[in-house]
């Protein structure tokens, strides 16, 4: 419900807030590296026996044989279980090495995260007018590393008796939000989804401190979820929104009241994102690209009503309402720009469109939101007899 001011005449200042820590609940109990590898070997043995094709289980990293052989380093071409691999020819990103590990990808991605909320309010008023003002700050660090959501919000709700027969007021809210666009759906792009697809024997980092991943042969096609989050930490999405209504109410005659109400909802969004290369990914390193997107949209609703309210002989009550309502929506635009192949993808100072390659992959696009309008007339009649029987017509 909307908070309103009081008629006490004394201003009332309030504060409400909390600070806490949040953590994800129970996670899936997954196999460690050796159990996962032994299970994979057992599955291959069963497949060989069922198909009666002979041979032994194999993996590019762990060789071929009755049991997997653990190499001293995983390699991009496949270590074949060798324990004498020399990593001195390390050359990122084409020739990399990483030790056999027991990585719990969930634990690497998950964290205890702070959440806080602070709100101050000021309310008061007299018979001539009331007010309720508030300001709020909310910050939630995500349980996924390098993720967050923050919001600044102010509200104003006022009403004034200008004359005995005239009243005006408003109820307006402004909010600014910012986050880094963390995916919350159930698709494979969800960070937690990657934690169950990643091979546990691959570490987060290789021997040189660069991100490790599925480019090590025989480890699947997963993307390193920690790498994805770190690379996306400077991306952000902002939204400015103003919404609320202004109203006025006038008593034309003793039993006849006119009310007008104008509501508006304006939103401006801005999207700022660098999609970086993924050198440790098995499918493709990809091209980096930087995209900026800006859009705005607003809608308004204007409602006018006449209300006749009359009581006859203390037992007959009649209320007649007539009104109009007009709506406009889709009053906005969207602009998108994108360019590829940035030389310094980690330097946010270079994240501007004209620093990218001006080739045929560039994107410059604008969209029209699709304006539409509605207008309606409505009416309602309510009659009650002795506060026992009610009849309504619309």
Range-by-range predicted roles:
Residues 17, 135-141, 391-394:
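Transmembrane beta-strand segments that form the barrel wall of outer-membrane beta-barrel proteins
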